[in-house]
């Protein structure tokens, strides 16, 4: 009986999803990306070799796995081919195992130009995007003016649609942002060149996924970013431009929701955030520096330092609720090694009224007006990195994990104690 698993981040991204997806693909025949674009950064370590993927699903490093990019992904042809070349130079067969939905909206140079001009214009109020054109590409999709992957293979349609959409964006760039415009012929020529390399990988992804599931093949749906960055349920407006929650796996790939059997929520043992936006448990002291240095907390896509803080159970519970999380995978436990005392944010208190509440507010302003209520637990000095058996963890680490489980009101299925595939403790395998 086929079992399909959705892997999502329960925080603000960077939870370590790439390593877990790579580990889970041992029992999957297909891995599906269903939202986001090359703003994601999934880091995999196999046999000591580090690979960072931004667009192609993490299952590509398993020879028996077919990878799919669903319609919910905004696709940069240039970023795609750069990643294909990088992997194939390393001996990985990509073009023979990657299938891309023809209805993916494209990210083209004018999206990147608008993204950069917009952030520059906002100054101190900027969102902190990756500058890769993700937001403007999703805007075109919703406005029904997007150029989709299928358009690359219809030259007359491509030329006409590109002229129309580029006139619109160049008007904005020139007259509103006072920025340089984008050349039509250069974009058109580049699209036509890249089209022939991409054509063999284009497929009817919903049909292939349905057939794979009907044939009792396990599928893994790989989320990007994290639930707290979701365009609807995140800390708006400091969010990404797509739906990052588990429900998006259905919409963004073309499979029915009844085909999704298990949701694995990836959660760091502490909390991080990149870019702007409220972060109640953020630490600006020596402990925050410890987390940043030990956790190597620098964005794999932008290289920006991540903001670090204590584990926020209130935010985690909201993510668990909106995703219907079946089980948690706790990552980066080893980063807490050496800390005398640990804290978990178990509630919020209004900075103005002192009112207590235990649910994540909707919207950035309300969250910024909250301060965390902490519960303290003893830390541990022993090393947890690489441990593969729960009973071998220090007692204080075991107690910390049990408390995380209690305050999240969700069972822990897995624990990651290091970046390599093998550095994993498993209580319940999502594929059964």
From Swiss-Prot:
Enzyme class, first EC level, given as a word: ligase
Matching PROSITE patterns: ADENYLOSUCCIN_SYN_1 (PS01266), ADENYLOSUCCIN_SYN_2 (PS00513)
Cofactor dependency: Mg(2+)
Keywords: Cytoplasm, GTP-binding, Ligase, Magnesium, Metal-binding, Nucleotide-binding, Purine biosynthesis
GO MF, one example: magnesium ion binding
InterPro entries, A to Z: Adenylosuccin_syn_GTP-bd, Adenylosuccin_syn_Lys_AS, Adenylosuccinate_synth_dom1, Adenylosuccinate_synth_dom2, Adenylosuccinate_synth_dom3, Adenylosuccinate_synthetase, P-loop_NTPase
Record note on cofactor: Binds 1 Mg(2+) ion per subunit.
Listed pathway(s): Purine metabolism; AMP biosynthesis via de novo pathway; AMP from IMP: step 1/2
Chain residues that bind Mg(2+): 14, 41
Binding site for GTP: 13-19, 41-43, 306, 332-334, 416-418
Keyword tRNA processing listed: no
Primary location group: cytoplasm
Annotated binding of substrate, by residue: 300-306
An annotated GO BP: IMP metabolic process
EC number(s) reported in the record: 6.3.4.4
Gene3D superfamilies: Adenylosuccinate Synthetase, subunit A, domain 1 (3.40.440.10), Adenylosuccinate Synthetase, subunit A, domain 2 (1.10.300.10), Adenylosuccinate Synthetase, subunit A, domain 3 (3.90.170.10)
GO cellular component: cytoplasm
Purpose: Plays an important role in the de novo pathway of purine nucleotide biosynthesis. Catalyzes the first committed step in the biosynthesis of AMP from IMP.
Membership in a protein family: Belongs to the adenylosuccinate synthetase family.
Subunit structure: Homodimer.
Designated name of the protein: Adenylosuccinate synthetase
Higher taxonomy: Bacteria, Pseudomonadati, Pseudomonadota, Betaproteobacteria, Nitrosomonadales
């Amino acid at each position: 009986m086929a079992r399909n698993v959705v892997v999502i981040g329960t925080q603000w991204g960077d939870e370590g999803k790439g390593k877990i997806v790579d580990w889970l693909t041992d029992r999957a025949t297909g891995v599906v990306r269903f939202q986001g674009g090359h703003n994601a950064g999934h880091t995999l370590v196999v046999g000591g070799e580090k690979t960072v993927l931004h667009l192609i699903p993490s299952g590509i490093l398993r020879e028996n796995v077919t990878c799919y990019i669903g319609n919910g992904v905004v696709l940069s042809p240039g970023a795609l081919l750069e990643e294909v070349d990088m992997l194939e130079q390393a001996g990985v067969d990509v073009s023979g195992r990657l299938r891309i939905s023809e209805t993916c909206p494209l990210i083209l140079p004018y999206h990147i130009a608008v993204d950069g001009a917009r952030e520059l214009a906002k100054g101190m109020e900027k969102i902190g995007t990756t500058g890769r054109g993700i937001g403007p590409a999703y805007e075109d999709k919703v406005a029904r003016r997007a150029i989709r992957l299928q358009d690359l293979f219809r030259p007359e349609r491509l030329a006409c649609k590109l002229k129309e959409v580029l006139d619109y964006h160049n008007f904005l760039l020139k007259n509103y942002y006072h920025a340089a415009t984008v050349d039509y012929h250069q974009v058109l020529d580049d699209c036509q060149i890249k089209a022939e390399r991409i054509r063999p990988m284009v497929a009817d992804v919903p049909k292939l996924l349905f057939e794979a599931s009907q044939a009792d093949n396990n599928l893994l749906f790989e989320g990007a970013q994290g639930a707290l960055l979701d365009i609807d349920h995140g800390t708006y407006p400091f969010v990404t431009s797509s739906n990052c929650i588990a429900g998006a796996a259905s919409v963004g790939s073309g499979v029915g929701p009844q085909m999704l059997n298990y949701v694995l929520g990836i959660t760091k043992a502490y909390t991080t955030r990149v870019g702007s936006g409220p972060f109640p448990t953020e630490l600006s002291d020596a402990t925050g520096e410890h987390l940043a240095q030990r956790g190597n907390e620098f964005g794999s896509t932008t290289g920006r330092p991540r903001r670090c803080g204590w584990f926020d159970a209130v935010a985690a519970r909201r993510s668990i609720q909106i995703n219907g999380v079946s089980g948690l995978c706790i990552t980066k436990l080893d980063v807490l090694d050496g800390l005398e005392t640990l804290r978990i944010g178990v509630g919020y208190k209004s900075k103005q009224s002192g009112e207590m509440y235990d649910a994540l507010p909707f919207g950035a302003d309300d969250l910024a007006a909250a301060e965390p209520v902490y519960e303290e637990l003893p830390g541990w000095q022993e090393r947890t990195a690489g441990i593969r058996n729960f009973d071998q963890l220090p007692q204080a680490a075991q107690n910390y994990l049990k408390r995380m489980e209690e305050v999240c009101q969700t069972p822990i299925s897995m624990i990651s104690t290091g970046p390599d595939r093998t550095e994993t403790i498993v209580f319940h395998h999502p594929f059964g």
